[in-house]
Amino acid sequence: MTDALIRLEQVAVTLSGQSVLDNIQLSVKPGEIVTLIGPNGAGKTTLVRAVLGLLKPDSGTVWRKPKLRVGYMPQKLHVDQTLPLSVLRFLRLVPGVDRMAAESALEEVGAEKVIDSPIQGISGGEMQRVLLARALLRKPELLVLDEPVQGVDVAGQAELYGLITRLRDRHQCGVLMVSHDLHLVMSTTDQVVCLNRHVCCSGHPEHVSHDPAFVELFGKNAQSLAIYHHHHDHAHDLHGAVVNDAPATSSHTHTHVHGDHCKHG
């Protein structure tokens, strides 16, 4: 798997004496979209932090391609309502970014009209596009998107997932995405990893949606809806740090597998 951008092998994390992640195996290749799904408390945010290098696993390894450029899009941005901050000034917090670079990134995500708007005054969908534009400013080889459609209506969610696919196609970057809605990402993602502190099952989304481990986690409606209700319990500051954090179509083919700790066939 030398062509991987990032690879996790037997990763385990314990926080406050409790196992949060156990024996995680995961990799993302260039041009591949991998989606993490799982209930609240499944360890998705912890896994993302391990991928970003913000948290060191207690055991196992996190291998990254040397000098890997990563663009990160947090779930939610916490901005003081009294802070005079335009979208342009927010994007220019990224070192080396001028107005031209900011405009170019916003055009890529279809949000160029908000460049001079106060960041507190834009809509939820516009905010997600601005956060995505900020991730693109780093010219990433790997995009890490933590709930990229958070706070967006269903129509807007489908548009954003389509945009993510187009960006993947254009830049041939790998994408690691956390999502709560397998139904909407069915045509976007190449591989789904169902997480509940360990990898319950993984593979093509259509296969995972019928897997007993997936159905057990998400209930009897899982096969038709593949959805659960996400309760967002934390936000991020301007630099992506967690505030009050709690402990496509593609030619890629994947084998549908179960995690080591699953009791499903």
Swiss-Prot record:
- What are the record keywords, sorted? ATP-binding, Cell inner membrane, Cell membrane, Ion transport, Membrane, Nucleotide-binding, Translocase, Transport, Zinc, Zinc transport
| EC number, UniProt record | 7.2.2.20
Gene Ontology molecular function: ABC-type zinc transporter activity; ATP binding; ATP hydrolysis activity
Domain called ABC transporter: residue spans: 6-221
Instruction: List the signal peptide residues.
Output: none
Which residues are listed as membrane-spanning?
A: none
Q: Where in the cell is it found?
A: Cell inner membrane
The UniProt entry's GO biological process terms, in alphabetical order, are: response to zinc ion
**Quick one: a GO cellular component term?**
plasma membrane
CDD domains this protein is in? ABC_Metallic_Cations
Listed binding positions for ATP are G38, P39, N40, G41, A42, G43, K44, T45
The answer to whether UniProt assigns keyword ATP-binding to this entry is yes
Keyword Coiled coil found: no
Concerning Pfam families, the annotation shows: ABC_tran (PF00005)
Q: Which reaction does it catalyse?
A: Zn(2+)(out) + ATP(in) + H2O(in) = Zn(2+)(in) + ADP(in) + phosphate(in) + H(+)(in)
Quaternary state and interactors: The complex is composed of two ATP-binding proteins (ZnuC), two transmembrane proteins (ZnuB) and a solute-binding protein (ZnuA).
Its biological purpose is as follows: Part of the ABC transporter complex ZnuABC involved in zinc import. Responsible for energy coupling to the transport system.
Instruction: Please give the name of this protein.
Output: Zinc import ATP-binding protein ZnuC
Q: Which organism is it from?
A: Pseudomonas savastanoi pv. phaseolicola (strain 1448A / Race 6) (Pseudomonas syringae pv. phaseolicola (strain 1448A / Race 6))
Q: Which gene encodes it?
A: znuC
